[in-house]
């Protein structure tokens, strides 16, 4: 009796209903898979006609190009970001390396960047060597 109450309570707690059980098909019966119908659309062979993609508008105004960061606004509405004076930006922004990455020989051996690059190169070397090994 107590087991029946416990079983019933666990079914209610798990939101399990006897009607939710799958219906067993009869032995020897075939199951047929029905695929969804393809959407009917205008155009070529069996596909929906896609809308042509448009390129963004290109600004050619020289004053707008020199005072605003064009294309930085990610929202549909709103204006582009206005550029500020250099003194309003942090100093580290002008020290960012925009060129090719430094080689291992150019870095100081006591720096964190040196050890990160050394580890990365060792991982690349290990991956290259282990690529040809058989299982």
Curated annotation (Swiss-Prot):
Disulfide bonds: none
Keywords annotated in UniProt: Mitochondrion, Ribonucleoprotein, Ribosomal protein, Transit peptide
Annotated signal sequence range: none
Pfam families linked: Ribosomal_L37
Gene Ontology BP terms: mitochondrial translation
Transit peptide feature, positions: 1-14
Main location: mitochondrion
One Gene Ontology cellular component annotation held by this UniProt entry: mitochondrion
Compartments (UniProt record): Mitochondrion
Family designation: Belongs to the mitochondrion-specific ribosomal protein mL54 family.
Subunit structure: Component of the mitochondrial ribosome large subunit (39S) which comprises a 16S rRNA and about 50 distinct proteins.
Full protein name: Large ribosomal subunit protein mL54
Species for this entry: Mus musculus
Gene (name only): Mrpl54
């Amino acid at each position: 009796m107590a087991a029946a109450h416990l079983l019933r309570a666990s079914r209610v707690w798990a939101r399990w209903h006897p009607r939710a059980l799958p219906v067993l098909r009869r032995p020897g019966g075939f199951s047929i898979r029905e695929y969804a119908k393809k959407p009917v659309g205008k155009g070529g062979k069996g596909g929906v006609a896609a809308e042509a993609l448009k390129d963004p508008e290109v600004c050619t105004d020289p004053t707008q190009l020199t005072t605003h960061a064009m294309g930085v606004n990610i929202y549909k509405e709103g204006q582009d970001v206005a550029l500020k004076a250099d003194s309003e930006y942090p100093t580290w922004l002008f020290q960012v390396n925009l060129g090719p990455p430094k080689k291992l020989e150019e870095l100081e051996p006591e720096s964190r960047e040196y050890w990160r690059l050394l580890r990365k190169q060792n991982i690349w070397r290990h991956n290259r060597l282990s690529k040809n090994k058989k299982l």
